[in-house]
Amino acid sequence: MKIIKKYKLWILKNIDSKYLEILNSKYIYLTKIPNNKHAVISDLFPLRIENNWNTFFELLNVPRLINPVQKINNEVEICFFDYNGKLLNVYEKVMLDQIKNTLNLKEIAKKLDITKDGTFAVFHKNDSQKLSSSGSFISDRGYVGYQNINHGPIKGYVHGNFDAVSKKDKLSLLGVSSFFKKHYIIQYEFSPEYKYELFWVNTSNTNKTITLVNLSSSNDKFSINIKPGGVKSYLFKPKDISKLKLISNLNMARPVIFRYMNGSFDVFHG
């Protein structure tokens, strides 16, 4: 059984899901497994710092949560990327006895001369021998808070989406795609009362096109192109109650959705 398990793990690490899918449609997965057993993983979170937006991150002392008895200094790297997926700069932080720390990413980005929207990733550098020996990884898909004074004083929070990128000696995107077009219907009905902004991050290592189809009324279509590691958004104001279908080669093109109301906003996954 151990040999079979090791063989399956080798396949998952070294053979792209799209090739396995040709053999059997059941053999698909959403993210890759890092080749380096000491790698750490993060989501690629949308960073909003333009037009009075601010982004906050609830940073947890993950090594301390794994081993609460031992006092461990949690060394963290926050990587900032532009909207095309280019690495701009890295911010390092050490958590001592804190369990949680709220980071103001707009302030941090300003110190790094970053003024434009993009994405960010959070890597906990502490290597856990117990985790790596069992084939597990430290991953951060924690909570991100967004705030805009034009939409009221309250932050809107949303959790991470995917194991998007890994880091050890280098950064590696973990998203997978398919030879076949995938149809994903957003699990939400869009109301004509509100405006919406949908954000997608391309976690794969190839350019991707996502086509939006309005399933209600006119069947209108709109396509966006996203570079590897990049992020794109789409503003949507429906004329009536609407459902959106997404067509792409990504195994799951799940967006982060902002709903803009009069004096407030909400943020959630689609």
What are the residue ranges of the model-derived segments?
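Gly/Pro-rich, tryptophan- and cysteine-flecked surface segments typical
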Residues: M1-G270
